[in-house]
């Protein structure tokens, strides 16, 4: 089986995750989903899209590029596949299948939860930082052709199942939509490797057609609509809005070809990701251009504190006490 090794799970980490699982059931769902969020993702919609079939419709081979929004890594010695250590056979990677264009509003290009930043924008799609700060996946690297060489991912984001506080713990156990991302030094564009993964018991392998589905689930969640993977081409475009913490984002999406191959060549997990005789990836990259169209009267993390259940404030203290026992 083709795989990438996963970091060994320690007793401490497993204990923290078990505690987090219990905390998920304690925090009321009505409090865990901020009233200011109007994004349209749901568990049912997520499962529905996951059942979609693969596609192989990208046939154009010339590079399609949005001027000024990003530089193709391929133009300067970089790659559009991540670098995964320890694969068999060696040299396999995962596709950088979503790009947040540097033509987006500058606030969205800042790695922050505040002021409408990237992390707040990702919460429109239910993508949050990892469970209690515990990184369970193996690190991957990417070379974006920006003079930095091979760079480790900034971080991994996981689907929070509607609970923005500790819901990513559920994704760690159950699997689902997740992504790694890197920031191109020359443009400030974000390059993301998005996929749908299996549960923890399955070693977080990628589900059949999981790279294409992950890309399209993210696009659908950000634009508030279902994306039919089977009908996509390099002329497909989508637009839609989503809100989180009183920030409303307009997302315009262009699917482009020429950056990735319509192929299984060099793709990690290709044997399990291929579906119905179709290749592991369809060769399409979703390029997002994002504008903030509405803002709260006052911004910043402190404005959200009254909405946070008291138990989430106490969690760090509880974890510190537990860690002292190990």
Task: Map each language-model feature to its residues.
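Intrinsic disorder/low-complexity signal
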Residues: 5, 13, 30, 323-326
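Acidic/proline-rich low-complexity IDRs
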Residues: 13-17, 22, 45, 54, ...
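Intrinsically disordered, low-complexity segments enriched in proline/serine/threonine
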Residues: 7, 30, 36, 91, ...
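Mature extracellular/extracytoplasmic regions of secreted and cell-surface glycoproteins
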Residues: 25-288
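Short, conserved catalytic/metal-binding micro-motifs enriched in Asp/Glu and His
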Residues: 1, 15-22, 32, 299-303
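Bacterial N-terminal signal peptides that target proteins for export
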Residues: 3-14, 307-309
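Cleavable C-terminal sorting propeptides in eukaryotic secreted/cell-surface proteins
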Residues: 285-326
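Cleavable N-terminal signal peptides of Sec/SRP-targeted secreted and luminal proteins
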Residues: 9-29, 289, 313-319
């Amino acid at each position: 089986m083709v795989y990438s090794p996963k970091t060994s799970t320690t007793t401490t980490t497993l204990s923290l995750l078990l505690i987090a699982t219990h905390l998920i059931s304690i925090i009321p769902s009505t409090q865990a989903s901020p009233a200011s969020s109007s994004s349209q993702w749901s568990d049912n919609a997520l499962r529905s899209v996951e059942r979609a079939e693969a596609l192989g419709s990208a046939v154009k081979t010339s590079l399609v590029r949005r001027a000024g929004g990003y530089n193709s890594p391929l133009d300067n010695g970089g790659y559009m596949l991540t670098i995964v250590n320890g694969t068999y056979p060696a040299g396999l990677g995962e596709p950088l299948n979503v790009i947040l264009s540097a033509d987006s509003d500058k606030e969205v290009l800042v790695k922050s939860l505040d002021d409408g930043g990237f992390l707040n924008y990702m919460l429109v799609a239910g993508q949050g930082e990892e469970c209690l700060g515990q990184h369970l996946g193996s690190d991957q690297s990417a070379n974006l052709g920006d003079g930095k060489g091979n760079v480790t991912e900034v971080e991994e984001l996981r689907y929070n199942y509607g609970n923005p506080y500790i819901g990513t713990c559920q994704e760690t156990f159950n699997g689902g939509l997740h992504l790694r991302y890197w920031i191109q030094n020359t443009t400030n564009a974000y390059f993301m490797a998005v996929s749908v993964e299996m549960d923890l018991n399955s070693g977080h392998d990628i589900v059949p057609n999981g790279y294409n589905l992950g890309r399209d689930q993210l696009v659908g969640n950000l634009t508030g609509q279902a994306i039919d993977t089977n009908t996509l081409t390099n002329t497909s475009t989508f637009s839609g809005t989503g809100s989180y913490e009183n920030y409303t984002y307009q997302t315009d999406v262009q699917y482009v070809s020429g950056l990735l191959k319509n192929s299984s060549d060099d793709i990690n997990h290709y044997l399990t990701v291929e579906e119905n005789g179709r290749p592991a990836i369809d060769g399409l990259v979703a390029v997002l251009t994002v504008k903030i169209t509405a803002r709260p009267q006052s911004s910043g993390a402190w404005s959200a504190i009254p909405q946070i259940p008291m138990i989430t404030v106490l969690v760090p203290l509880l974890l510190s006490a537990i860690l002292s026992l190990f």
